């Protein structure tokens, strides 16, 4: 990670902006892997740590909060396999708590936000957090009309036909149900049904499924509803979206209503009145967890009264009145059989542990991530000892941790079980794929050695070249249907010059080369006339492409989808962008300064872009690519109607018509950034009685000031 995990409070403003840009890209990538592809590659705990770091930086540097910040997002974009459904009300995710202390802070924060209320006067509900797939069921005139996944929270996937096969979901509602109601909850697969399904797969000699959650998700996304029907999916109802008439004024009452309408609800849900009671129920559910016939990963707390929920409102991606108290990660012991090295698109050598099969949290684990060379040696990202400095050696008895549906990780070693004479692991200094030197670069900014060892072979390295091509055709880049991983590997390995694809421009010359060839692609096993025709159509459909997609597809290190959009908006055309990057090559002058001044582009990212354009081989590939495709000019950003959107606001003094938290939440919901101090970047200071130095400084700097009534008039109440 950037800044070597420097404490947030020690970051400079430039470093903070740089790291926020990195976190946007990194979290968006993991969101897509988890929500869109059901293929997460980091643990829930690591993901949550990235989110917490992002939130801490934004809290200290509110002026740097980006429009595409992870704090404003919910999940990943929906797949194109099913028709999109626009949710009438967004399906928000929940903030997480990880300790009893965090849970107490959640309760205390509710009381602080709402103001003067007696202790124990606010009731809460507590229920298991089901590890499944979020679902919204829309009923009109008491008939099920649409079922949609959460997707990115705003737009989901229409899976109505498949949902109709789940017997425990009502097709119609009783006569007393509202005309319009969206019942929301979780689709899951019972552990017993999962075990039976895998037993059936084993009997047929077919590959086993990994875990119930991924199996439920895959089952729900089947194009053939008969397959879904055979998978015995289940449902728990616990929330709602659009509803034409409220049947209750409490969370608990709403869930009881769902039960009366025929929906399954969780029997472990309780209504409680204090943090102590919530924690008591949390630990009760934690003890019951192994015996439940469904996977859970925590307990959800919600304020019970709906009028208080309305007052508390929402953050950009989550309700303020609810939180998910997560369980600790599950662990098990097994033997490390070996360490394999994988080579990624940027040349990173990633060690992966081969383990004796072990069941962790109901899932058979055979591989685990080892992160990097230092992690194996017992050294953390900042050079600090981890595992008390214990290294990891082949043959060791290790502790494996699985947190969520991800590649597990080795968290410790049982030293008493280490074999006498076991040798320390020697990380390779050459690429296992191409034999090129593998080096650990020096970070020019920090002077520290990079934690990752990288192959220097570049496009000479088969692994890097193939991964570059896979990235180029991926969904957020050129998105060429029919060019998946297997097809890319086939074309790359082909020795026929009319079939070979070694660099991105080769994709767009394939059809021309095939016209003059006797070896027709349509005659090769796995292809046919129809599939080849569709492949050429998909390739030709991408000869004009959005500028940000083009930049992202180049595979420049540190340039993710979000950074590519920033660059596209800032430079407008590819010609302008390329010329500016070449001019910035000296790391000085107007072009370099302009690049670094883009909000969200820090020095590390800027250097990576400039270095890309210094490499003649990259320039040749891009030049050849531009002979085949045309990047479109970037669209200008659409402005919002809110009078305070994009403005930085500071509240000071006492507010009489709302609490400070309510004022902040309202401002942020209108697109404003709320800061804690006044600076030249401040646009508005809202001053109540008792305003002091902040108001004085605002006047000194010429910042617009107003009282609470003027503020409410400005934002429309």
Curated annotation (Swiss-Prot):
Which positions are annotated as binding NAD(+)? Answer: 44-48, 93-94, 127, 150, 186, 302, 326
UniProt keywords (A-Z) are: DNA damage, DNA repair, DNA replication, Ligase, Magnesium, Manganese, Metal-binding, NAD, Zinc
Reaction(s) this enzyme catalyzes, per UniProt: NAD(+) + (deoxyribonucleotide)n-3'-hydroxyl + 5'-phospho-(deoxyribonucleotide)m = (deoxyribonucleotide)n+m + AMP + beta-nicotinamide D-nucleotide
Question: What GO MF terms are annotated?
Answer: DNA binding; DNA ligase (NAD+) activity; metal ion binding
The record's listing under Pfam families reads: BRCT (PF00533), DNA_ligase_aden (PF01653), DNA_ligase_OB (PF03120), DNA_ligase_ZBD (PF03119), HHH_2 (PF12826)
Q: Gene3D superfamilies per the record?
A: 5' to 3' exonuclease, C-terminal subdomain, 6.20.10.30, BRCT domain, DNA ligase/mRNA capping enzyme, Helix hairpin bin, Nucleic acid-binding proteins
Give the Enzyme Commission number.
6.5.1.2
At which positions is Zn(2+) bound? Answer: 431, 434, 455, 461
Q: Does the keyword Calcium apply?
A: no
Q: Does the keyword DNA damage apply?
A: yes
Q: In this protein, which residues make up the domain named BRCT?
A: 639-717
Give the top-rank taxon of the lineage listed in the UniProt record for this protein: Bacteria
Gene Ontology process terms (BP)? DNA repair; DNA replication
Q: Which cofactor does it need?
A: Mg(2+); Mn(2+)
Its Gene Ontology cellular component terms are:
cytosol
**What does UniProt list as catalytic?**
129 (n6-amp-lysine intermediate)
Which NCBIfam families does the UniProt record give? dnlj, PRK07956.1
Q: What does this protein do?
A: DNA ligase that catalyzes the formation of phosphodiester linkages between 5'-phosphoryl and 3'-hydroxyl groups in double-stranded DNA using NAD as a coenzyme and as the energy source for the reaction. It is essential for DNA replication and repair of damaged DNA.
* Family affiliation: Belongs to the NAD-dependent DNA ligase family. LigA subfamily.
What is the recorded name of this protein? Answer: DNA ligase
Q: What is the protein's species of origin?
A: Sinorhizobium fredii (strain NBRC 101917 / NGR234)
The gene name reads ligA
